[in-house]
Amino acid sequence: MYELVYRVLLRRLPAEAAHAAGFWLIRVAGAVPGGPWLLRRWLAPRDPVLRVRALGLDLPGPLGLAAGFDKDARGAASLGALGFAFVEVGTVTARAQPGNPRPRMFRLPADRALVNRMGFNNAGAAAAAERLRKRQARRARWAGRATGPGRGRNPVAVGVNIGKTKAVPADEAIAD
């Protein structure tokens, strides 16, 4: 599936547009009724030997996604359905900010590399917190419907990466 989507669509787009399109596809697949179930069924590893206990959490596997992909806490459930046991959202700053001017992400094909100079573009801490509150409320409604590590509607653990708002002077970073 990745080869098809990547070769046919994403590779032909500028890097930042490919990132946005890929994330949109993941979110849509996770929002369609039955979508998360299908994603987990087709793509997520389910071998019990992969289960991990870390930081007091029972996780369905050892693989997580670091900050930078889901900057605004919009797709943790969909990313969990792909098989990530934990997702770090952000980097989130206290205030919304646009990030660096474009182009700010580009490919270096000869080096098989991607350069990211995004600059913490995000909708701000209040927006991310509201999305996470809504996610938690949805999880609470589904509590008790499935048991055990990595089970239930949205089994992915979520962390938040925080950063300094660009407009804030360095000596005020802690207060920010």
Give the location of each predicted region.
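Conserved alpha/beta-domain cores
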Residues: 59, 67-69, 80, 91, ...
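An N-cap/entry alpha-helix motif that binds or orients negatively charged groups
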Residues: 1-52, 116-121, 125-126
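Flexible glycine-/small-residue-enriched beta->alpha junction loops
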Residues: 92-124, 135
